[in-house]
């Protein structure tokens, strides 16, 4: 048996903002029809539970101009109204709003105070019309899986390993080589000092014998 995800909505005179609250949605399918039928389905959770919802919106919509963005925590839709006017509610006037549909107060503005559009900077959108109603969209799960396909992040390890391959970094161990060289220089000078000391000792013995004689 399917479950209903929480759906939040807000509007401007020319558009409706619909947010489907469902984290880590997989195989997300969103469909929008000109007559105003909005349907959603996806799986989520460790058990792969099926979530579905179907809403008959208050009026007709412009599918071609409507957009959708699939995120990690939710699916955000900007639905363009076919006619720029305020809706009394999200669903048709002769229907009661389902219990899982709520007002999105973070995006809501009053009709007398038609504020600016919602800031969508940083969000990636696709057009409903250009995606065939988004029916074939693999959803966030597939998208994230595709990122896993980059596997290239594991490439960071290869890159780091490659730096080891530079050997030059190991060359920083060259500091030890410099130290070894200085040690060698010191050891080379020691025999010379010993010879000088021996010659000095012989000279002192000669002087002592001369004084004795």
Curated annotation (Swiss-Prot):
PROSITE patterns for the chain: CS
Domain CS: 2-91
Biased composition, class Basic and acidic residues, residue ranges: 188-213
Disordered, as annotated region: 168-213
The protein's name in its UniProt record: Uncharacterized protein Os08g0359500
Family: Belongs to the p23/wos2 family.
GO biological process: chaperone cofactor-dependent protein refolding; chaperone-mediated protein complex assembly; negative regulation of cytokinin-activated signaling pathway; positive regulation of gene expression; protein folding; regulation of auxin polar transport; response to heat; root meristem growth
Residue ranges with Acidic residues bias: 176-187
Pfam assignment, any one: CS
């Amino acid at each position: 048996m399917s479950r209903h995800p929480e759906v939040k909505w807000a509007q401007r005179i020319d558009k409706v903002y619909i947010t489907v609250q469902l984290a880590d949605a997989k195989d997300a399918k969103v469909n929008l029809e000109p007559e105003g039928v909005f349907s959603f389905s996806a799986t989520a959770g460790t058990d792969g539970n099926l979530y579905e919802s179907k809403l008959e919106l208050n009026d007709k919509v412009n599918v071609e101009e409507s957009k959708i963005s699939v995120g990690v925590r939710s699916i955000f839709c900007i639905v363009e109204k076919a006619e720029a006017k305020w809706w009394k509610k999200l669903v048709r006037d002769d229907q009661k709003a389902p219990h899982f549909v709520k007002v999105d107060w973070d995006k809501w503005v009053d009709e007398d105070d038609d504020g600016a559009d919602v800031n969508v900077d940083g969000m990636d959108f696709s057009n409903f019309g250009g995606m065939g109603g988004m029916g074939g969209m693999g959803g966030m799960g597939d998208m994230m899986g595709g990122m896993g396909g980059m596997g290239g992040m594991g490439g960071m390890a290869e890159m780091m390993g490659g730096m080891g391959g530079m050997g030059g970094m190991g060359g920083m161990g060259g500091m030890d080589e410099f130290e070894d060289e200085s040690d060698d220089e010191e050891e080379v000078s020691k025999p010379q000092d010993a010879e000088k000391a021996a010659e000095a000792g012989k000279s002192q013995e000669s002087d002592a014998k001369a004084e004795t004689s």
